[in-house]
Amino acid sequence: MNKKINQKKYLEALNFAFKLHSKQFRKGTKIPYFFHLSAVSNHVIENGGHTDEAIAGLLHDAVEDQGGEKTLKLIKKKFGSKVAKIVEDCTDTKVIPKPPWFDRKKQYISDLKKKPQSSLLVSICDKTHNASCIINDYYRVGKKIWSRFSANKKQVFWYYESLGKCYYTNLKGHKVLKQNFKKLVTEMSRIIHY
């Protein structure tokens, strides 16, 4: 059962996220980045998320992509400490420039195991959308999709497979969400080894 969403607070976050990411696009595409944020937030709501989780879904990339610690402080001021904590938990770095890809991802997975359920929910919704986009883009553009990443395709697969194990072990409930993520990882394995 879905919890009631505070629409006024959500709309404020929607506008804030849109402004923050208005000049950003998905890697290798002309798709405005905001659509990813919206998809993640919608997925959170569809999986029973409450207002703070849904807002964190909209803002989950704001810190690492749009200003680091300064942006996190602004999120806390505008939307509260619960939202800021989830966003921080879903951020793989607050450091600009970003550390190397593998180091960030390895640390993210290690830290994710200790995170609260709200953060795990937003994270799996984010990574589900990312994995789905990778697979869809693979079928659209082929193997050149891997050039979009700071890692090779086997490292990308390692990351998603490791995330799946983390979600299965640490995210309570959400059986269908975890099964869907597992299916995406299986499909990713197939296209990587193709």
Language model features with spans:
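Active-site helical microenvironments for divalent-metal-assisted chemistry
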Residues: 1-194
